[in-house]
Regions:
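Bacterial N-terminal signal peptides
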Residues: 2-14
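Hydrophobic alpha-helix-in-membranes signature
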Residues: 13-15, 32, 186
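Boundary at the C-terminal end of the N-terminal hydrophobic targeting segment
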Residues: 14-24
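Active-site-proximal helix/loop segments of hydrolytic enzymes
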Residues: 26, 55-239
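Short glycine-rich His-centered loop
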Residues: 27-47
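Acidic active-site catalytic centers that drive phospho-/nucleotidyl reactions
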Residues: 32, 39, 50, 100-102, ...
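Short glycine-enriched, charge-decorated loop/helix-capping segments at active-site entrances
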Residues: 44-49, 204-208
Length: 239
């Protein structure tokens, strides 16, 4: 941890105009492109790497959200970043949302759906969503607990917008002990945006037009969450 000390500076500012409406600060959205550097993530049959897809998608989402929100990326280039550092960036910047981006892999070359995860402490077999022993041992994982209801709503909003791109098998909203979500002190979700091990889906995830549509859908889901953060019932979620 780096502590930065800043000297106090007194500024002479004009007196505020009485009656002028206060301007609220824009919401902060942190986009986390999964993997990076030597941690390549899933590799598609055509050689596409998860780390590259997630970074391209993150930049497109950033572009779609700018102007309405303060948008930060946990990484802006191809380098390794530990999971706790990703969550730490969101916490340090007092983010209102954390969106972690991934792609999936499967032994089945026809697997093709969209999974949007929110945090739970239940076990699940998935390298992107399984919490590490270190994260399970730290009390920081407890900070996500109060945000789980809101995280599930955020996941539902995003999935509702993006599922049309996966018409034959739209997937769903799933609880999982995702390590990157465990210590997030704000609503947070992890998006598995398709299977690179499916040649057709790999082609889609290399297509800029397709990625733009996906980025737009995710951005609309974020807008929907901020505009309508009402509670949804458990029957709306795939357990």
């Amino acid at each position: 941890m780096v502590v930065i000390l800043t000297a106090a500076v007194t500024l002479l500012l004009p007196a505020p105009i009485l009656g002028a409406p206060a301007q609220s600060a824009p919401k902060t959205v942190v986009i986390d492109p999964g993997h990076g550097g030597g941690d390549t993530g899933v590799k598609g049959t055509g050689g596409t790497l998860e780390k590259d897809v997630t970074l391209r998608l993150a930049r497109l989402i950033e572009n779609r959200l700018q102007g309405r929100y303060r948008v930060l990326l946990t990484r802006n280039d191809d380098y390794i970043m530990p999971g706790p550092d990703r969550t730490g960036q969101a916490n340090h910047n007092n983010a209102d949302l954390l969106i972690s981006l991934h792609t999936a892999g499967s032994y089945s070359p026809t697997a093709n759906d969209l999974q949007v995860y929110y945090y739970t402490e239940a076990e699940i077999r998935n390298p992107d969503t399984a919490a590490s022993g270190e994260s399970k041992a730290t009390p920081w994982r407890k900070v996500q607990k109060p945000h789980i209801p809101a995280s599930s709503i955020l996941a539902q909003r995003i999935w509702e917008r993006a599922k049309g791109l996966y018409a034959n098998n739209p997937g769903g909203v799933v609880p999982a002990p995702a390590a990157v979500l465990a210590g997030a002190d704000m609503p947070a979700v992890l998006i598995e945006s398709g299977y690179l091990t499916n040649p057709k889906q790999e082609k889609n995830l290399n297509d800029n037009k397709y990625l733009f549509k996906l980025a737009s859908a995710i951005s609309q889901g974020i807008d929907d969450y901020f505009n309508n953060p009402e509670t949804i019932t458990s029957t709306d979620l795939r357990e």
